[in-house]
Structures are given as structure tokens and as C-alpha cells.
Amino acid sequence: MVSSEDFYLRTNNVSHMKVVITGGCGFIGSNLAHELVDENEVVVIDDLSTGRLENNGDLLDNENYRFVKGSITDLDLLKQIFDGARYVFHQAAIPSVPRSIKDPAKTNEVNISGTLNVLIAAADNNVTKVVYASSSSVYGDTPVLPKEESMVPNPLSPYAVSKLTGEYYCKVVTEIYGLKTTSLRYFNVYGPRQDPSSEYAAVIPKFITKALDRESPIIYGDGEQTRDFTFVKDVVSANILAAKSSETGIFNIGGGKRVSINELAETIIKASGTGTDPGLTHVEPRDGDVKHSLADISRAESIIGYKPSYTLDDGLKETIGWFIE
């Protein structure tokens, strides 16, 4: 993993590099804040609609950390916050396929208009680079595996449409205004600080919570659908590598291996250490879910130097340990 020390630009009479993390109290944003705060001035903006203040509770007294409660839909606020920033890590979003289907208008407002605001504010403040959190959902249910960045997108939900639109805005802003941008297509990120309590929580924290409570995990569909799961520390590393790189464009960020949801659930039950097997509960599949997903990460490996450091077993062990604590 790339360390914050590698990322820190050491220059005379400058104590820290300023970086801004939108959605920095969320799952991925808070992990990124913890990685960068020792050697950088980290400013987090989050409206706490899905992020949690306690994710960065241990940073509140850190002189390198500053929290601003606000929304990326507030362009004037973003322009103020981005003043003097070297990099912007844009993680803020409504991060859920089911929620986007339930409320497409709000998803559009935050994920599309909010992203455009981030890009405008960054360009106006001469930010060196914006790293944008996109999603593997832009590929849709294309049967070809693994997913390559050159594939024609086929979004199946308002969330996926919003993430793809954000990529297009990044590309256009780079070409017209000269702001360097990189879009990272995340594949099923998991790890510490991921909220299991939300109605729209991701599968791994839900499964872990069920396993620790000795309850049967709920699986949508037959469970034979497959996913490429990526540990959050590898995603943090990818963000830092993308920021440091002079390259722009789109990169898949995944683990490079896939596992069925049934197998995932069974692995989590065993790794939970409860000594019980509550079995699996299957229910009707959800709208907007894809059948199979697997990242081709060769472009990220060759261009920005990304290489996943955590196997699924390693990542689950650390994640379950965090939930137990």
C-alpha cells in the first residue's frame, strides 16, 4: 500500500499539502482521511446524510484534520473549501442502486449536479487533480468477463447512469478546461467503517452482522451471481496512486478475482468464529442487480501502478475483526 509519506510533497517552508475529500465521513472517504492525515492537511466535507461523524471521531482533535458539514450541491461552499487544495478526492454520492431506483431525482441532484459542482470548483481553484469515485455498475449486465474499460457502458439503474455521467463530465472538463481528472471504477468495495445498519447496506457488512448474531444471511436470487470484491485499503491506495500520476482517464479498481454470493456467505459464516451454521436464506432478486462482475485491472496496474495487496480472506479477517471490536 502507498503510504502517506510517499504521497506527501516535501517542500521548503510548507508544512502540509492540502487535500479535500468529499464524502469524507463515509466508508471509503474516512479510510482515505485516516491514511492521509498524518502528513497532509485533510479537509473533509460531508452532509452526513449517509456518512457518519464517528468514522473520523478519532481525528477531530488532530490539527491536520478539518471537518466541514455541507453538501456538494452547494457550489459556493465548495469554491471556498477548495481554495489552496492540491488534490480533491471526490467520494461523495448517494451510493446505492436500490435507493437510486426509489429516488432517482435526488440521485441525479447529488451524483450528477454535485459532481459537476466539484469539477467547477476545482477548476476555478486551479486544483492539480480530481480523483472521482465511479463504479463498476456502469458496465451493466454485459456477459463478457472480465470487464475492460474499453467496453461500451450499459447502465441498468439511475445510480449507474449517474456515475457514468460523472465520468463524462470529468472527461469534458479535462479536455476543455485543462483540469486533470481520473475516474476509478470501484468493484464492490468492503472493509472497516462500512455501515451495516442502512436499508441499502452492502452485502458484506450485512452478512458479517448476521453471522456474528448467528442468524442466516439473506441472499437476493439464487446466490450464484458473482462479484469481484475489493478491500478498502486497496481502494485507498488506488486513489493516492491516481492522484500522484500524471495520467488521466478511467481505471478499473478491483481484486481481479470473483466469488459467488453463496460462497461469500459461507466463507463469512466460517470466518466469524461463532461455531454455528445458520444456513442461507434466499429471496427474490432485486431490480438493477447484475449477474456477474469481474474487473480487468491490467490498465491500472500498468499505468498507475495499482496492485491489490489483500486477498478476500485477508480482507474479511480484518473487516470481521473491526466489527467485533
Predicted segment positions?
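Generic structural signal for alpha-helix termini and adjacent loop/cap motifs
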Residues: 31, 51, 103, 121, ...
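Residue-level signal for the nucleotide or nucleotide-sugar donor/cofactor binding architecture
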Residues: 51, 73, 102, 110-113, ...
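N-terminal Rossmann-like NAD(P)+-binding domain of SDR-like oxidoreductases, especially those catalyzing
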Residues: 3-189, 233
